[in-house]
From Swiss-Prot:
Species annotation: Chlamydia trachomatis serovar D (strain ATCC VR-885 / DSM 19411 / UW-3/Cx)
Pfam hit, one: DUF5398
InterPro entries attached to this UniProt entry: DUF5398
Family indicated by similarity: Belongs to the chlamydial CPn_0711/CT_665/TC_0036 family.
Protein name: Uncharacterized protein CT_665
């Protein structure tokens, strides 16, 4: 009533704890290091998938690649929140 609910929600949102990854992303050098590490792993996995391998390792590499791509999306969202 009278917009009092929103002020309580804002206080809770500001008081929430940050995840370890969010804390690391606040440090610019660590953020660049994490982004570069993930990008290099994605490139390595895509190149190994293009070369071809046994079916079992192909499926594992696809799963890893999907995980790293999802991590890149999460990192992008964290970076947008910080700006």
């Amino acid at each position: 009533m009278f917009n009092m609910e929103n002020s309580a929600a804002k206080g809770e949102k500001a008081a929430r704890q940050l995840f370890d990854l969010e804390q690391d992303m606040h440090d610019v050098t660590k953020a660049h290091e994490v982004n570069a590490n993930v990008q290099s792993k994605v490139q390595t996995l895509t190149s190994s998938l293009r070369e071809g391998a046994s079916k079992e390792s192909f499926e594992k590499q696809q799963t890893l690649l999907a995980g790293y791509v999802a991590l890149q999306k999460v990192l992008g969202r964290i970076n947008r929140k910080m700006v």
